[in-house]
Regions:
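Short beta-strand segments enriched in small/hydrophobic residues
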Residues: 25-44, 102
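Gram-negative bacterial Sec-dependent N-terminal signal peptides
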Residues: 1-21
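Beta-alpha junction/loop-to-helix N-cap segments that form part of ligand/metal-binding clefts
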Residues: 40-47, 55, 59-123
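Ser/Thr-centric signal marking residues that sit
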Residues: 18, 35, 104-107
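Context-gated lysine
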Residues: 2-5, 24, 61, 88
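Immediate post-signal peptide segment of exported/extracytoplasmic ligand-binding proteins
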Residues: 20-30, 60-66
């Protein structure tokens, strides 16, 4: 299931990139609970997401550009931290999509507070 979501997310980004002929690279945020109660599972989740990005970049079919990933730690249990990390990704890193966060309280807060108001794709 995780692989399907990662592949679907990368496919979505590839389709979006084909509509913008000037794009040479796209930045995607990976907002995970690198610390906190899900810390022990995040390595595998992050690895899967990054494998999908690596494969997409290696294919050369992404308008001859690349997908860049920036990471942020949502800490899983504090929506304020997750929102701050997502805002940084949008305002400083200029992400076009955010993968995560993966804890329900953080997910709702980030979607309502950052993703929807800024028109960012949620993966």
């Amino acid at each position: 299931m995780k692989n399907i979501k990662s592949i679907a997310g990368v496919a979505l980004l590839a389709m979006m990139a084909t509509t913008s002929h000037a794009a040479k690279s796209v930045t995607v945020g990976e907002l995970q609970g690198f610390t906190g109660p899900l810390e022990s599972m995040i390595g595998a989740m992050s690895g899967g997401a990054n494998l999908a990005v690596t494969e997409a970049n290696a294919s050369g079919k992404f308008l001859q550009g690349t997908i860049n990933v920036v990471q942020g730690d949502s800490v899983c249990i504090d929506p304020a931290v997750a929102i701050a990390q997502a805002e940084k990704m949008v305002n400083e890193d200029n992400v076009m999509a955010i993968m995560g966060p993966n804890c329900s309280g953080n997910t709702i807060a980030v979607i309502e507070g950052v993703i929807v108001p800024n028109g960012i794709v949620s993966i």
